[in-house]
Amino acid sequence: MTEREQFFRDVNKIVIKIGTSSITRKGCDHTRENCNIDPAFMESIAFQVSELRKQGKEVIIVSSGAIGVGLNELGIAPKPREIPIRQAAAAVGQSMLMQDWSRAFSRYGMKVAQILLTYEFYSDRVTYLNLRNSISTLLEYGVVPIINENDCTCTNEIEAIFGDNDKLSAMVASKIDADLLIILSDIDGLFDRNPKTHIDAKLLTIVKKITPEIESYGGDPTSFKGVGGMRTKIKAAKICSMAGCYVVIANSDVEDVILKIASGEEIGTLFLAERHIQKNRARWIILARASGTVRVDAGAKAAVLGKNSLLPAGVVDVEGTFDRGDVVKLECDGKIFAKGITDYTSEELIKIKGVHTDQIENVLGYSNYNNVIKKENIGILEELN
């Protein structure tokens, strides 16, 4: 078994970021200014995702290209400075992108879901929890989430924050506890100098630690349509590395590139994850200050210890006042055995304690979540050490 195969042996949740140049490159004319979506490329991605799904892996896509495609559709020259024009192009291009993604995945019997994000998803805790829960639910139903920045309503300079979604993909990967982020573009990986201007540039196959020297290899953006140069990709790798997520930067032109990367083939540049840092978000949950206590019965305790979610039927009592998104202690027979991030407030839990999931709506008048605490939001105390 090769080193990469060992690294990726337990990879389960994968985020795939696809750059503008990859989605449109084969659909460009000789001027490289008028670009259309490349349906064949999208079908290739859909096929590879379907194969990963057969292996039991979860896949999320972060797709760029809305502005570039929209500009072409509206007959506007590339990279206009006026933000309203770019926002309009994003609105037109995004709908076209989703139509083509839906068409590509439908050929393999899969459905897709559009998720448009702004920077607030990262800074607002409740919004972040909603994102996690939404993506988790979509994956449970076999739907492929396709994420993009909401350029149409962005109040900051479009793409200035996320850099053609490089940073966005890293933030998504880190927040949903992905094991691997694959960044596909029109470049083979990270070189020690710009390969487009230096024929002797050397490809780095592995980066064990992102040092100032590694960051200096970033250079300036080189892609004509996208805004995500190597510098933003290195920053994305840095975010993921600290969250315990591997990153591979590779060329989307490689046949079955996603499948080859996931199987451990040495393609592109691999940035190692700092697995000892936040390897399991449960450590953070366990060390966080609890806002209250949820008492559960023995059956619920056994389910939680067995890596299952906490259901309202197993809740016996609630102590303290807390909101959705707060960390609470889980207690059984007078002993605290776990902590978790609750999806319901203390007031709501008091009303639905002991209630079966299908009765939540009858009690509250609504049912946002089937679980009180999702399994990925639980930390078992005995696992801290």
UniProtKB/Swiss-Prot annotation:
An example Gene Ontology CC term for this record: cytosol
Predominant localisation class: cytoplasm
Pfam family, any one: PUA
Family matches, as Gene3D superfamilies: Acetylglutamate kinase-like, PUA domain
Stored InterPro entries: AceGlu_kinase-like_sf, Asp/Glu/Uridylate_kinase, G5K_ProB, Glu/AcGlu_kinase, Glu_5kinase, Glu_5kinase/COase_Synthase, Glutamate_5-kinase_CS, PUA
Domain PUA: 291-367
Pathway named in the protein's UniProt entry: Amino-acid biosynthesis; L-proline biosynthesis; L-glutamate 5-semialdehyde from L-glutamate: step 1/2
Function in brief: Catalyzes the transfer of a phosphate group to glutamate to form L-glutamate 5-phosphate.
Protein name: Glutamate 5-kinase
Organism: Methanosarcina mazei (strain ATCC BAA-159 / DSM 3647 / Goe1 / Go1 / JCM 11833 / OCM 88)
